[in-house]
C-alpha cells in the first residue's frame, strides 16, 4: 500500500463521518496526500472544498464556515510557516469557542533540527490556544497491520472531533491535528496502489461521543432592580425576557415581549443587581456597572468559563432559577429611558450634517429583513449597530468577538455566507470599516473553480482610517497634531480599484441610496462603498450624550 495516501484517505473519511462539511485547503507539496483525498471527497459530494492561497485568510474563512453552518470546519495546509499563519484564526477560535480543526502536514519528525527544508517544530506550536494537539505519527508500510492502523487513525480523528466540538467539555474550540507524511506523497497508480480501509457501517463515526449536558442552575431573586447584560455567546433564557436587557448584536434575539434597554440609557438608571449572559465587551457604561462593587453580578454562561474582568461576580451558573417578581415601576422606568435614548440617537443623527459610520449602520439596520445574516466588523461597526438600535429579531448576527481583532473579517464574512447558505435561503450582509476591509482584502480572492457565496453584500463604511480612535482617549483634541497619523492611519486606498483587481462587483454610493441598493435582486459577491467622515464623530457622540 501507499502509507501516506491510505492514511490521508482514512482521516478525511472519518472527519466527514464526524460532521465536517467544509474544508479549506491551502496548496503545498507535503500535504499532497490530504489534498488528493479532499479533492476525491469533494468530487463525490461528501464535502465542499474551498482552495485558498493564503493560510491566514483560509483560517478565518474556516471560522466563518463553522459559525455560518453550525458545524466543525477544517483548514488543511503544508508544513512550516503555512502553519504559523493560522495563529490569528486559532486565537479567535479559542476565545469565541469555534470548532476549528487545523489539519497540518508535517515532515517526518526525525528531520527536526537537521536543517531540512520547510521544517519547523510545529507540533505544539499553538500552545494553550488549542483544546488539544494530536499527532498520528508516520504511517507504516505494513499491509498486514492495516486493520490495526485503521482503527488507530480513526480513533485519533474522533478524538480531534470531540475536542473541537467540546463533546465532553461543553467548550468547543480549535484543535491542532498534525500528520507527518513520508514520500511518496502522491497516489500510486490504481487500482492496487492505495486502499481505504472501511469505517463503521452506515457511515457512523468510529468512536461516537454524545454531547455533554452542562447544567448549573443558579437561583436569582428578581425583586431587586435588575438589568440583564447579554453579550457574545449569551444563550437563550426565556425566563429572563421581561427584564430590561442590554443585548449586544451577537446575542440571541429575545423572544417576543422582550424588554430592550439601550446601552446609553444605563447611566441614567441605578440597577441593584446585574445578570450577565455570555461575555459582553462593547460598551463602557456596561463595563463600569460590572465593576461597581456595590452591584452584585450573576454570570450565566453556556460553557465552563465565565467572564469577570473586575472580580465582581457573586455567583455563576448556566441558567437562572428565578424567585421574586420584578418591580413594575422599575420596568416602566427602564422602558421610558430606553425610548428616550433611542429617540436621542435618532434625532442627533438626523441633525448631524455629515455622514458618519453611525449613519451607515442605521441605514444597514433599517434595510435588513427576517432570514438575513449580518456580519459586523469588530471595531466601530458592531458598536454602531448597537447604538442605532439594531433589531436582531429574525436575524443571525455574527462578529469576531473572541479577541475582537479586525483581521480576517472579509474572509469570515465569505465563510459565514457560504456556511449559512447551506441550510438557509436568506442573504448575508456584512458591515465593516475601511481598515478592516483593506486589512483582509486578499480574502476577496476566490478562484474561478471555487464555491462563491450565493448572495453576499459587503458594505464598507469608508472614513479613510480608524474612526474608533476618534472616540477614545487617543482622539482627544490635545493630540490632534499626531493622532491622525499614528492612530487614524489614513491610507487613501481606492476601494473600487481593489475590488476590480479581484473581479468583485462594486460601486460607491451615498448613504441614502444604501437601503435601495441592499434591496436590489442579485447574486454573488459585491461590495458597496459609502464614504463617511470620522473627524466629527467625537462631536456627534457628545451631542447624543448631551441629549440624554
From Swiss-Prot:
The keyword Membrane does not apply. Pathway: Quinol/quinone metabolism; 1,4-dihydroxy-2-naphthoate biosynthesis; 1,4-dihydroxy-2-naphthoate from chorismate: step 2/7; Quinol/quinone metabolism; menaquinone biosynthesis. Its EC number is 2.2.1.9. Its cofactor is Mg(2+); Mn(2+); thiamine diphosphate. It is an enzyme of class 2 (transferase). GO terms for molecular function: 2-succinyl-5-enolpyruvyl-6-hydroxy-3-cyclohexene-1-carboxylic-acid synthase activity; magnesium ion binding; manganese ion binding; thiamine pyrophosphate binding. The keyword Magnesium applies. Keywords: Magnesium, Manganese, Menaquinone biosynthesis, Metal-binding, Thiamine pyrophosphate, Transferase. One of its GO terms (biological process) is menaquinone biosynthetic process. Binds 1 thiamine pyrophosphate per subunit. It catalyses: isochorismate + 2-oxoglutarate + H(+) = 5-enolpyruvoyl-6-hydroxy-2-succinyl-cyclohex-3-ene-1-carboxylate + CO2. CDD domains: TPP_PYR_MenD, TPP_SHCHC_synthase. Belongs to the TPP enzyme family. MenD subfamily. Catalyzes the thiamine diphosphate-dependent decarboxylation of 2-oxoglutarate and the subsequent addition of the resulting succinic semialdehyde-thiamine pyrophosphate anion to isochorismate to yield 2-succinyl-5-enolpyruvyl-6-hydroxy-3-cyclohexene-1-carboxylate (SEPHCHC). Homodimer. This is 2-succinyl-5-enolpyruvyl-6-hydroxy-3-cyclohexene-1-carboxylate synthase. The gene is menD.
Amino acid at each position: 500500500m501507499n502509507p501516506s495516501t491510505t492514511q490521508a484517505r482514512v482521516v478525511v473519511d472519518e472527519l466527514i463521518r464526524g460532521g465536517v462539511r467544509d474544508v479549506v485547503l491551502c496548496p503545498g507539496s507535503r500535504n499532497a496526500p490530504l489534498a488528493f483525498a479532499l479533492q476525491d471527497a469533494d468530487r463525490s459530494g461528501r464535502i465542499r472544498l474551498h482552495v485558498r492561497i493564503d493560510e491566514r485568510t483560509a483560517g478565518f474563512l474556516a471560522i466563518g464556515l463553522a459559525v455560518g453552518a453550525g458545524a466543525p470546519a477544517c483548514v488543511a495546509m503544508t508544513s512550516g510557516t503555512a502553519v504559523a499563519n493560522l495563529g490569528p484564526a486559532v486565537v479567535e477560535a479559542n476565545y469565541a469557542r469555534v470548532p476549528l480543526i487545523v489539519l497540518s502536514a508535517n515532515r517526518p519528525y526525525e528531520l527536526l533540527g537537521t536543517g531540512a527544508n520547510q521544517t519547523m517544530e510545529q507540533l505544539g506550536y499553538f500552545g494553550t490556544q488549542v483544546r488539544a494537539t494530536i499527532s498520528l505519527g508516520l504511517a507504516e508500510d505494513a499491509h498486514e497491520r492495516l486493520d490495526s492502523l485503521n482503527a488507530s487513525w480513526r480513533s485519533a480523528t474522533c478524538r480531534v472531533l470531540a475536542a473541537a466540538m467540546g463533546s465532553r467539555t461543553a467548550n468547543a474550540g480549535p484543535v491542532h491535528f498534525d500528520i507527518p507524511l513520508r514520500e511518496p506523497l502522491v497516489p500510486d497508480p490504481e487500482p492496487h496502489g492505495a486502499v481505504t480501509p472501511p469505517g463503521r457501517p452506515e457511515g457512523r463515526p468510529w468512536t461516537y461521543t454524545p454531547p455533554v449536558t452542562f447544567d448549573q442552575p443558579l437561583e436569582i431573586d428578581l425583586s431587586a432592580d435588575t438589568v440583564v447584560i447579554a453579550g457574545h455567546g449569551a444563550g437563550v433564557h426565556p425566563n429572563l425576557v421581561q427584564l430590561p436587557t442590554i443585548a449586544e448584536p451577537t446575542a440571541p434575539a429575545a423572544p417576543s415581549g422582550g424588554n430592550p434597554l439601550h446601552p446609553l440609557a444605563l447611566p441614567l438608571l441605578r440597577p441593584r443587581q446585574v445578570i450577565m449572559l455570555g461575555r459582553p465587551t462593547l460598551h463602557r457604561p456596561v463595563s463600569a456597572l460590572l465593576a461597581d462593587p456595590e452591584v452584585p453580578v450573576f454570570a450565566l454562561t453556556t460553557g465552563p468559563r465565565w467572564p469577570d474582568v473586575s472580580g465582581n461576580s457573586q455567583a455563576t451558573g448556566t441558567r437562572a432559577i428565578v424567585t421574586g417578581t420584578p418591580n413594575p415601576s422599575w420596568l416602566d422606568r427602564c422602558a421610558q429611558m430606553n425610548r428616550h435614548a433611542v429617540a436621542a440617537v435618532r434625532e442627533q443623527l438626523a441633525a448631524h450634517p455629515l455622514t458618519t459610520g453611525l449613519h451607515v449602520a442605521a441605514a444597514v439596520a433599517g434595510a435588513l429583513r427576517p432570514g438575513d445574516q449580518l456580519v459586523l466588523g469588530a471595531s466601530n461597526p458592531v458598536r454602531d449597530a448597537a447604538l442605532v438600535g439594531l433589531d436582531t429579531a429574525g436575524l443571525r448576527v455574527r462578529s469576531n468577538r473572541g479577541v475582537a481583532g479586525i483581521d480576517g473579517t472579509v474572509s469570515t464574512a465569505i465563510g459565514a455566507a457560504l456556511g449559512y447558505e447551506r441550510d438557509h435561503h436568506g442573504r448575508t450582509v456584512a458591515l465593516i470599516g475601511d481598515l478592516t476591509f483593506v486589512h483582509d482584502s486578499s480574502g476577496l480572492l476566490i478562484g474561478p473553480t471555487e464555491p462563491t457565496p450565493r448572495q453576499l453584500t459587503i458594505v464598507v463604511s469608508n472614513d479613510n482610517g480608524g474612526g474608533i480612535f476618534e472616540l477614545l482617549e487617543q482622539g482627544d483634541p490635545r493630540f490632534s497634531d499626531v493622532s491622525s497619523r499614528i492612530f487614524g492611519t489614513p491610507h487613501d486606498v481606492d476601494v473600487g480599484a481593489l475590488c476590480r483587481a479581484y473581479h468583485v462587483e462594486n460601486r460607491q454610493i451615498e448613504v441614502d441610496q444604501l437601503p435601495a441598493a441592499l434591496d436590489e435582486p442579485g447574486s454573488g459577491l459585491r461590495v458597496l462603498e459609502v464614504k463617511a467622515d470620522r473627524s466629527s464623530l467625537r462631536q456627534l457622540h457628545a451631542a447624543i450624550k448631551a441629549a440624554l
